[in-house]
A protein has these predicted regions:
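Beta-strand-centric surfaces of beta-sandwich/beta-rich domains
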Residues: 1-162
Length: 162
């Protein structure tokens, strides 16, 4: 124990390690993005501003898409239907910084937890993410996405220590 304690103290002090519990729970937020018109190819659908998910307050650590099958057994039901896996295959989520530079793009389909062996997609970016600059874009619409659909994201975050 004498050997481990100084190492743990060093990692905490240098900010390379944080004390955390489960990656889900009190720091997980559901975000719903309903479509006000039918989705179009190449149109950027930006996230609404959110004080909790703003990178100045919190760091986004994980993200997942809740699809219609997962929602069928979930206790929370949004006003519109979450995307199906077929619809999710057509789009991408873009993580952006303060300058709206794209830091990463991830297929929506790969963010569906039940199709990813039950694992959520973890995030770790050097450049802070600005939630309202992030967007979703579709490169195909073989399966229509209408006003009866929405993108349901579950975002896990960690408070930024000041």
């Amino acid at each position: 124990m004498r050997l481990v304690s100084p190492l743990i103290d060093y990692l905490f002090a240098s900010g390379k390690m944080k004390q955390v519990g489960s990656y889900e729970g009190s720091y997980t937020k559901s975000v719903y993005m309903p479509f006000t018109s039918n989705a179009l190819i190449g149109t950027s659908y930006y996230m609404a501003p959110d004080t909790i998910l703003n990178s100045k307050n919190n760091e986004i650590t994980a993200i997942e898409v809740v699809d219609n099958v997962t929602n069928s057994v979930a206790p929370t039901v949004p006003a519109t239907d979450p995307l199906s896996t077929t619809q999710a295959k057509q789009g991408y989520f873009y993580f952006c910084n303060m300058k709206r530079d794209v830091i990463a793009s991830v297929p929506l389909y790969s963010l569906i937890r039940r199709l990813n062996a039950g694992k959520v997609q973890f995030c770790n970016f050097d450049d802070p993410i600005v939630w309202q600059n992030c967007f979703i874009q579709f490169d195909s619409l073989a399966t229509a996405i209408t006003t009866s659909h929405s993108v349901w994201l579950r975002v896990t975050y960690s408070p930024v220590e000041n």
